[in-house]
Amino acid sequence: MSTDQPAVGSIFDLYKIGAGPSSSHSIGTERAARRFLARQPTPPASVRVTLFGSLAATGRGHLTDQGIRRALDGIPVEIVWDTDAGNLKHPNTIRFDALGVGGRATNSWTVYSIGGGNLRDDSGPVGDDEPARYSHRTVTELLALCEAQGLSFWQLVEKTERAPWPRLETIWEAMEASVRRGLDSRENFLPGPLKLARKARTTLLRGRDLASPQRDLALLAAFALAVSEENAAGGTIVTAPSCGAAGVLPGMLYYYHTVKGLPRRDILEALATAGLFGSVIRANASISGAEVGCQGEVGSACSMAAAAGAQLLGGTLRQIEYAAEIGMEHHLGLTCDPIEGYVQIPCIERNMTACLRAAECAVFALLTDGRHLVSFDDVIDVMYRTGADLQSAYRETARGGLAELWRRRMSGQSKAGAATAAPAEHHSYCD
């Protein structure tokens, strides 16, 4: 397990409002560029930014360079995409070099975008992360503490965090807005070369006239798709725990609030509980697809949403823990292989299916007494170890899996087109 943090940090280090499409490749790198500029005694003549590992492999599709240029505020920037460097301390490594008038480096800084928009350098955490707030590191310990003190998970958050409710209200408002924008969008396609069709609005329009349970499934799907499509379009979302998995938890909560009519306070309490589980994952493993694959992003999001759903259904502490465990256990080994490096295929549909699965996990957990053989903490440990075993091709480098299949397909079409001298035809596949 990761041992960088002594205990579980604030849930507000997990929930960040920002622009998609990637928390590590977009939000994190832009934050790093701003931080680097603030460190300079005088503005440099220019800046050279070298992106390594996953950032170099998929950064163009994640709009990494655009965010860096925006953060450096008009200073000339050279972006170097180094996909060959090995022995990196983290797959999302960035080096900033401040350059003088003659092009000589006057100041350098290496920083790591570790997921969820969070940063770390060789000295430790970077930025405005709050101090660790929870006295324990595992859900097992936190659950025992809650039982001993007669607290729910959300009450533990209330007791531990600094003024949580106004901050959670702000987070929820941003989540709600991202769902509504995604549903209201009249754009037919997402940006990028895939020309992927938006499906949230049509899913909503077609699904709301169905009979239950199909209607409920369709609405959950539409809400999750809405946020994921907004994220892919570079819209404002909340990391939960990342941009690439930002549709799962809001989709679940929006459904219970708008369809089932649960009051806003219940939603905020569920958001607090989900944040606690996500923070445990962040402290003990990783929420970065570049480090552990998509199990750390969508798997974590499903786990968080399952915990939230179980709480909204009236689950006990142990039933909530069980729901979260199921949500992660059945995403173990999930790869991160985005086609062309864009947070679109398989990411958007994956958010949708994880939202549906989270709802199922919550319902099933409440049909039990909450006792089970593999704990939430056990499965988080296995997730982290599994991620370490994944080849780099399956950790956000767009070199394996679906990304490789697509690349071979496009290469074959290019060769066929060159042989016949016919103009290239853009295909729209099932996604």
Label for each model-derived stretch:
Residues 46-82, 269-313, 317-323, 329-361:
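A structural-propensity feature for long, helix-poor, extended segments
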Residues 14, 18, 220-228, 270-278, ...:
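Short alpha-helical scaffolding segments that buttress acidic/His motifs in well-ordered protein cores
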